Amino acid sequence: MSEICHRSNTRPVRVGNLTIGGSNELFIQSMCTTKTHDVEATVAEILRLEEAGCQIVRVAVPDERAADAIAEIKKRIHIPLVADIHFDYRLALKAIENGIDKVRINPGNIGRKEKVEAVVNAAKAKGIPIRIGVNAGSLERHILEKYGYPTADGMVESALHHIKILEDLDFHDIIVSMKASDVNLAIEAYEKAAKAFNYPLHLGITESGTLFAGTVKSAAGLGAILSKGIGNTLRISLSADPVEEIKVARELLKSFGLASNMATLISCPTCGRIEIDLISIANEVEEYISKLNVPLKVAVLGCAVNGPGEAREADIGIAGARGEGLLFMKGKTVRKVPEETMVEELKKEIDKLAAEMEEKRAAEEVQKANA
């Protein structure tokens, strides 16, 4: 292919109760930091991730204890579980046997053809997809010898090599990732991959860093990739609590209009005109709307003179003034409220609008089901 395969045209692949690919929908993924064999700790972390908005979660499976824990973990969580396997095909077989929803393994790295075939047959029997994880830092020796150093072309060649192994065994439930720590390399690799095949792509900038630096780096790289219509799932990799990865991912998707079930906050950068503690109010409102599953736009602005007009695209908002606030909807002032109660008044209106949106969505789903 010479053209980029847009995410909506990728091959649909089932992962648990989700369909990855074949639509414009992206799913947010994270990875547990716990030892997988510690079921209690792993389940507790996954439940926190679920609450934050994680839709797929990966766990490391370095040994048999981890593989054995999968069945119990699956019973206690509500999102698809992915097993991260390196080299040992027996761990992949055990993970599949114990009900894993997807396996991340590079077929070229697990040995003889019979081993690959065993994993593929087990995955086929249970409808389990395989994610091929290409990483610039661990390309095959023959590719590094050919290109001299990690390149986008080398990464695509590696992906095609692993894809061919699976396709030769008539296996096509494939997802591919093309991760690199270098932002420009990752952008180029994903773009070339989207031109080379139509399998769904999992996005990530690997080893991106700590919470602040990693957020900036991931947003820069993944934002460029998303803007090209590439990507079906994504993970923000941070050296931080994995819940922070979900928060960043949600904001990134909202920035590109790719989140149909998340609320958005609009707030001004503050200036000498403000008469309220806008920063703390904005943080409070942002936290309040973070659990909403509707596309509500909320504004918190410091200036009652320009505020409502500047945020007319917001569904609801407040603009501060001396001793009072203006509550507005779609740029039009609804009423004045005392400063000490304006946040609570805003929250009440948010709850009303969110409930209306939920009711409307439910009615549309019923209508769609009956059509």
UniProtKB/Swiss-Prot annotation:
<dbReference type="InterPro" id="IPR016425">
    <property type="entry name" value="IspG_bac"/>
</dbReference>
<dbReference type="GO" id="GO:0016114">
    <property type="term" value="P:terpenoid biosynthetic process"/>
</dbReference>
<keyword id="KW-0560">Oxidoreductase</keyword>
<dbReference type="InterPro" id="IPR045854">
    <property type="entry name" value="NO2/SO3_Rdtase_4Fe4S_sf"/>
</dbReference>
<dbReference type="GO" id="GO:0019288">
    <property type="term" value="P:isopentenyl diphosphate biosynthetic process, methylerythritol 4-phosphate pathway"/>
</dbReference>
<dbReference type="GO" id="GO:0046429">
    <property type="term" value="F:4-hydroxy-3-methylbut-2-en-1-yl diphosphate synthase activity (ferredoxin)"/>
</dbReference>
<feature type="binding site">
    <location>
        <position position="268"/>
    </location>
    <ligand>
        <name>[4Fe-4S] cluster</name>
    </ligand>
</feature>
<feature type="binding site">
    <location>
        <position position="310"/>
    </location>
    <ligand>
        <name>[4Fe-4S] cluster</name>
    </ligand>
</feature>
<dbReference type="GO" id="GO:0005506">
    <property type="term" value="F:iron ion binding"/>
</dbReference>
<comment type="function">
    <text>Converts 2C-methyl-D-erythritol 2,4-cyclodiphosphate (ME-2,4cPP) into 1-hydroxy-2-methyl-2-(E)-butenyl 4-diphosphate.</text>
</comment>
<dbReference type="GO" id="GO:0141197">
    <property type="term" value="F:4-hydroxy-3-methylbut-2-enyl-diphosphate synthase activity (flavodoxin)"/>
</dbReference>
<keyword id="KW-0479">Metal-binding</keyword>
<comment type="pathway">
    <text>Isoprenoid biosynthesis; isopentenyl diphosphate biosynthesis via DXP pathway; isopentenyl diphosphate from 1-deoxy-D-xylulose 5-phosphate: step 5/6.</text>
</comment>
<keyword id="KW-0414">Isoprene biosynthesis</keyword>
<feature type="binding site">
    <location>
        <position position="303"/>
    </location>
    <ligand>
        <name>[4Fe-4S] cluster</name>
    </ligand>
</feature>
<keyword id="KW-0408">Iron</keyword>
<keyword id="KW-0411">Iron-sulfur</keyword>
<dbReference type="GO" id="GO:0051539">
    <property type="term" value="F:4 iron, 4 sulfur cluster binding"/>
</dbReference>
<dbReference type="InterPro" id="IPR004588">
    <property type="entry name" value="IspG_bac-typ"/>
</dbReference>
<protein>
    <recommendedName>
        <fullName>4-hydroxy-3-methylbut-2-en-1-yl diphosphate synthase (flavodoxin)</fullName>
        <ecNumber>1.17.7.3</ecNumber>
    </recommendedName>
</protein>
<dbReference type="InterPro" id="IPR011005">
    <property type="entry name" value="Dihydropteroate_synth-like_sf"/>
</dbReference>
<dbReference type="Pfam" id="PF04551">
    <property type="entry name" value="GcpE"/>
</dbReference>
<keyword id="KW-0004">4Fe-4S</keyword>
<feature type="binding site">
    <location>
        <position position="271"/>
    </location>
    <ligand>
        <name>[4Fe-4S] cluster</name>
    </ligand>
</feature>
<comment type="similarity">
    <text>Belongs to the IspG family.</text>
</comment>
